[in-house]
Amino acid sequence: MQNQRIRIRLKAFDHRLIDQATAEIVETAKRTGAQVRGPIPLPTRKERFTVLISPHVNKDARDQYEIRTHLRLVDIVEPTEKTVDALMRLDLAAGVDVQISLG
């Protein structure tokens, strides 16, 4: 596992959940002796939707909705076998999407 890097990309709609998940990942990696870079906050993606309230007339009557997607990036440099095992056993919140890549 030497000279490798694990890149973990987290995505969630709630910033509290994603911050809690990144804190758990960083703490687990540091406890097992790996070097951690991050968490790096990536730009938040904002999607806005405008919906007409009235089905027929009154075009001025509209509702606007927004979905914010928060992103974080964590790099684990020189992970050990204990680090990989601990990360595999880690149980994160259901609202957090995790993508892991080895490089």
Swiss-Prot record:
It comes from the Bacteria. Signal peptide: none annotated. Transmembrane segments: none annotated. GO terms for molecular function: structural constituent of ribosome; transcription antitermination factor activity, RNA binding; tRNA binding. Keywords: Ribonucleoprotein, Ribosomal protein, Ribosome biogenesis, RNA-binding, Transcription, Transcription antitermination, Transcription regulation. One of its GO terms (biological process) is ribosome biogenesis. One of its GO terms (cellular component) is transcription elongation factor complex. SMART domains: Ribosomal_S10. PROSITE patterns: RIBOSOMAL_S10. NCBIfam families: PRK00596.1, rpsJ_bact. Involved in the binding of tRNA to the ribosomes. Part of the processive rRNA transcription and antitermination complex (rrnTAC). The complex forms an RNA-chaperone ring around the RNA exit tunnel of RNA polymerase (RNAP). It supports rapid transcription and antitermination of rRNA operons, cotranscriptional rRNA folding, and annealing of distal rRNA regions to allow correct ribosome biogenesis. In complex with NusB is involved in the regulation of ribosomal RNA (rRNA) biosynthesis by transcriptional antitermination. This is Small ribosomal subunit protein uS10. The lineage of its organism: Bacteria, Pseudomonadati, Pseudomonadota, Gammaproteobacteria, Enterobacterales.
